Amino acid sequence: MNWRSEHIWIELITGSRKTSNFCWACILFLGSLGFLVVGTSSYLGRNLISVFPSQQIIFFPQGIVMSFYGIAGLFISSYLWCTISWNVGSGYDRFDRKEGIVCIFRWGFPGINRRIFLRFLMRDIQSIRMQVKEGLYPRRVLYMEIRGQGAIPLTRTDENFTPREIEQKAAELAYFLRVPIEGKRN
């Protein structure tokens, strides 16, 4: 959801609470749990699940490797579930022409820098820059060039914008901020 008026533009940023992250976290959790159960059943010599008889999987080396993969997968899936619950990467971009201030807010990982809040004056914005990388994995990112601070990304690298969408977004934002557009192709 985005909100725009004559003087204020607020753009909400989706964080890690995306459908694909939920799917990957579930698949990884269930798969690693399966590996761990098979490794444990080969260690105990009993069938904890009826799909594989425990005699077919020897604990050394197959059971150890499956247990290791199961434990590693559980750690990775717990990392994904934590980023989903903390909603890492979500936030908003607020452009206020009336007060001449730009605010960028993102949620990070817990700790000192959990809240990432950037604030600068609109007169310090030099340009809006599009970085376009074509090829097998195309990448189109929108940056805001700030005097003395460099380029700050406004879009995520995993957002799949078409060339027309990224150009339209850059043009609208540049028009709203009254700054030029720069393009860069790789």
Swiss-Prot record:
The chain crosses the membrane at residues 22-42, 57-77. It is a multi-pass membrane protein. The keyword Metal-binding does not apply. InterPro entries: PSI_Ycf4_assembly. Its main location: plastid. It is found in: Plastid, Chloroplast thylakoid membrane. Keywords: Chloroplast, Membrane, Photosynthesis, Plastid, Thylakoid, Transmembrane, Transmembrane helix. GO terms for biological process: photosynthesis. The keyword DNA-binding does not apply. GO terms for cellular component: chloroplast thylakoid membrane; photosystem I. Seems to be required for the assembly of the photosystem I complex. Belongs to the Ycf4 family. This is Photosystem I assembly protein Ycf4. It comes from Dioscorea elephantipes.
